[in-house]
Design a protein with these regions (language model features):
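Carboxylate-rich, polar loop motifs that coordinate divalent cations or form catalytic acidic clusters
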Residues: 1-224
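A structural signal for alpha-helical segments
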Residues: 188, 261, 284-291
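Intrinsically disordered, compositionally biased low-complexity regions
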Residues: 217, 227-229, 259
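Long, well-ordered core segments of solenoidal/helical folds
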Residues: 224-254, 292-308
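Alpha-helical packing segments of well-folded alpha/beta enzyme cores
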Residues: 229, 269-272, 276, 296
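Solvent-exposed loop and edge beta-strand segments that line ligand/cofactor-binding
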Residues: 255-270, 361
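Well-ordered alpha-helical scaffold segments within catalytic/enzyme domains
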Residues: 271-287
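Extended ligand-binding groove/face enriched in aromatic
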Residues: 288-361
Length: 361
């Protein structure tokens, strides 16, 4: 709480405060796990458990397995230690081991976290066991919404939601154990989550194998949310001659590198956009909505008129300067045509899929 940072290393425990790095005395390295709550701070490793006090570090005589993987304290004198042999509940000089399947999901404990109601969530190979001091309360496995059986960390958020890091993203569980998944590059630099921490504003900082991701807490009204999404729609997805289409990223994960692309569903997407603007006009009588709905309708009509036929519709319209197209014009060798016919006897090669409009635009 005083801003001191502790580092457990191969040869000692170090503290960093006031721009000074200090080697802590009285511990036997290596130190692999550090946990703190309120005024209680513990350091653990294969050679024992130490607790910090005003007089320095004192070793605690708790008989536990040497394979320490994680630890948490409830701030009331109790210490939970996860090992490869199960989880130890340490208090008043005594340690109790829980390792059976009626106590945990498995004995390979990798993460511990305390829920607001005081229950201890134990992440193991196989899922999460929710315990109180005495018995198992609930098991959380992929059947209950966990994204992966390999749990890496468990951290309560400021609002009481339990965030469970796995090797396949994050699953958040509310007080009713309802899950919600945070997964893929939409949320994370990499799906293998190593740790989670929350700042004073409730934002989550997630350490992954691909870097650190920030999941920000943002409160908004429904009207504000609509305004944000509508801005993104108009800025990114509307292109001339008023097509509502998809985009792609030139650099994966870099949203600033977006570019327009053609899609054979451009008519369908623009039709959905036309319906949206029509509903907006019907509700608000906004002239802006009326104008944009008319432009969308004109594009849908142009899909037919641009072909200069009685009933043939184009799938999309793009500028002639585009050089990156889906299903671009190409030629086929006799061997390629034969290969396609073997796969699909009804196959018909079309070499000239894209045709220049009469106005050349």
């Amino acid at each position: 709480e005083d801003g001191t940072v502790l580092f457990g290393t191969w040869n000692c425990l170090y503290s960093y405060a006031n721009l000074q790095l200090k080697k802590e005395e009285g511990l036997v390295p290596p130190i692999s796990v550090i946990c703190t709550s309120g005024n209680e701070t513990f350091a653990l490793g294969p050679n024992g458990i130490w607790q910090h006090s005003e007089n320095g570090w004192k070793q605690l005589n708790y008989p536990i397995a040497r394979s320490v993987r994680c630890a948490e304290t409830d701030g009331k004198g109790s210490l939970w230690v996860g090992t490869d042999a199960g989880i130890y509940f340490c208090k008043n000089g005594k340690s109790t081991l829980y390792q059976n399947t009626n106590e945990l999901i498995s004995a390979y404990v990798r993460a511990i976290g305390f829920a607001p109601n005081g229950n201890c969530w134990v992440g193991t190979m196989g899922g999460v066991a929710v315990r109180n001091d005495e018995k198992l309360q609930k098991k959380i496995t992929p059947a209950e919404g966990l994204s992966n059986s390999f749990v890496t960390c468990i951290v309560p958020s400021p609002d009481g939601t339990m965030w469970i890091g796995t090797e396949l993203g994050i699953v958040r569980f509310d007080r009713e154990y309802k899950p919600s998944l945070r997964f893929s590059r939409r949320w994370l630099m990499n799906d293998k989550v190593n740790d989670i921490a929350f700042d004073n504003e409730g934002n989550a900082w997630v350490a992954t194998n691909g870097g650190v991701s920030q999941i920000k807490r943002n409160t908004m009204t429904l009207a504000e949310k609509e305004k944000d999404f509508y801005h993104q729609l108009m800025y990114r997805h509307i292109r001339e001659p008023w097509t509502c289409g998809s985009v792609y990223l030139e650099i994966p994960g870099d949203t600033a590198s977006w570019r327009h692309e053609d899609d054979d569903n451009d008519g369908e997407y623009t039709g959905g956009y036309l319906a949206m603007e029509s509903f907006r006009y019907a509700t608000t009588k906004s002239e802006d909505a009326h104008t944009k709905a008319r432009k969308a309708f004109d594009f849908l009509r142009q899909l037919q008129t641009v072909t200069r036929t009685a009933g043939f519709f184009a799938r999309s319209i793009v500028p002639p300067t585009w050089n990156k197209l889906h299903d671009g014009n190409r030629t086929y060798t006799p061997q390629q045509i034969a290969d396609e016919l073997v796969k699909d006897p009804r196959y018909k090669p079309v070499e000239n899929r894209w045709r220049l409009s009469a106005d050349g635009k």
